């Protein structure tokens, strides 16, 4: 499940804000150097600490122009200061492996059920029952978020069809048609650890464009993963993903990003799917995060629908996404959510 990117607008361009939210005055006193929320203005555009929200990544989007905050649905409920999600003990590694294996098994199970005429709500129910009854896991998206006028996510999986970029809500009214491209995004909690992964499916016979977009998007994900090792930078990963997508005349959605993950669903760092080589956070052994590029067949511009969750392409052209959860190892990486077909 993607994290919405935290950005600050400073003319003439967009910049990533290293803070996920603006700390309160009380928090700032405990952590000198952070910016403070005061009467809806940043006191200083200086960021010394990385903050994260353990509740809802959509609640922590702040955009500023000339210091002023422009946003919707802000509702800070629970915050914690941490630099990055890390898997530091053998118990943590085993926990993440088990959670990742469970998440992958849901995608392996659901494939045969993706057929024309099936509703996305039916797919959700099949996945929910499998996650809860067969895997003894918790579906992390169910009732996730909420507050500040935004409803909690009402289903156990995300089903994003055709021009839906991400966070599509399963519905009994959404019946798959022949040729539909569908991303199913799964996040499970097993013994306190999260496994987060997604895959593209097709209902019936898909178009050549849909198949090509899905293939290139999966390649983008792997090109990013292949660069993961201690000493690499997140900008290297983003650049590799962006370069491959644009070389194939596709575009990268920039409003959503990968995220740190372990015992917290959405944690630091923010893993951008675009960027410049040699920039960004330096990877260290034990860091765990997702890489989950969203690639559009048309322009990268998106909008959020009135349900406050579903993101769609503005030009209504196709979008695709693939996702894995992985960890930085001593000499490379380990993917926790590999499926049988990938091994």
Give names to the regions the model predicted.
Residues 23-24, 34:
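Short linear motifs in low-complexity or flexible loops
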Residues 2-6:
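Intrinsic low-complexity, disordered N-terminal segments enriched in polar/charged/small residues
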